[in-house]
Regions:
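Conserved, single-site charged/polar hotspot
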Residues: 1-272
Length: 272
């Protein structure tokens, strides 16, 4: 492993450890960069489902008020080899993994211009906030899928698509209305049936959606998934507190809120 700190560089042999904490004076001089010729770097202070994860590429260590930031600079194709098996069971098969690889690659490329972690010199993190990365063992099947689709991305009218994806659908994909945007402005995100049935219900109708969501259609791809249909119980005091914490800012922004009674708009208008 090659270690660079300021203008000083030294090497440690494979299998040896390099220990550092937030009180280490070397961090005050700038970032510490760890690299290898063609190997991986294991970080013993990080735990993932496979144990201590190993990383290709460079590891940068930088001191911030919250502690030491660990930044992994890595080639996108190598990155994808650790995203694909972390986001999809490899038991789904190589063709499904190829689809996942294209989605993950498209999403990754769209993130190269974001500024979410610019203060750390990074684009994304390794969690579900972006894409889960390096959270399971390496997989030959996932590697094969990434290699077979190398460079392939999703495009719409010549533009790269930010390919949002999820673990389980209710039988339909979501469109941009989920984020309050106009679906007509984003036709690439049209809601479609996620199954083999040709029937398409008007799930924008409150009544039709209730009928749909309370039933189960075995033709839906995710019909056997645990989260295909689910329910939860929220106490009235908890729900009231949550509602009250949000209603003030909503009214200041929107001016009024319409109260629904039995799923239909009422003539009551609550203004702030």
């Amino acid at each position: 492993i090659h270690i660079t700190c300021a203008d000083v560089q030294w090497d440690i042999a494979a299998g040896e450890s390099f220990d550092i904490d937030s009180n280490d004076e070397r961090l005050a001089t700038g970032r510490i960069v760890l690299s290898t010729d063609d190997g991986s770097i294991t970080i013993n202070s990080i735990k993932r489902s496979q144990g201590n994860p190993s990383y290709k590429g460079n590891i940068e260590l930088a001191l911030y008020d919250e502690g030491i930031a660990v930044i992994n600079e890595i080639d996108i194709e190598d990155y994808l080899k650790k995203v694909v098996p972390s986001e999809m069971p490899v038991s789904f098969g190589v063709n499904a993994l190829k689809c996942q690889a294209v989605c993950a690659r498209s999403y990754a490329y769209t993130q190269l211009t974001n500024n979410y972690y610019s203060e750390y010199g990074a684009h994304i993190d390794d969690s579900v906030s972006f894409q889960v990365y390096n959270n399971t063992y390496d997989s030959a099947e996932a590697d094969e899928a990434v290699i077979a689709t190398a460079g392939m991305v999703a495009v719409y009218n010549g533009e790269l698509v930010k390919t949002y994806y999820y673990s389980t659908s209710c039988g339909y994909t979501a469109d941009v209305c989920a984020w309050g945007s106009d679906e007509d402005n984003y036709p690439q995100y049209a809601s479609v049936r996620a199954g083999t049935s040709d029937y398409n219900a008007d799930i924008k109708s409150e009544k039709t959606f209730e009928q749909f969501i309370t039933a189960k259609d075995s033709s839906d791809y995710d019909s056997e998934a645990d989260m295909y249909r689910w329910k939860t119980v929220i106490g009235i005091s908890e729900l009231t507190a949550h509602f009250n914490s949000l209603i003030g800012s909503y009214l200041r922004k929107n001016g009024s809120v319409y109260i629904l009674e039995n799923g239909e708009p009422s003539d009551k208008d609550c203004k702030h």
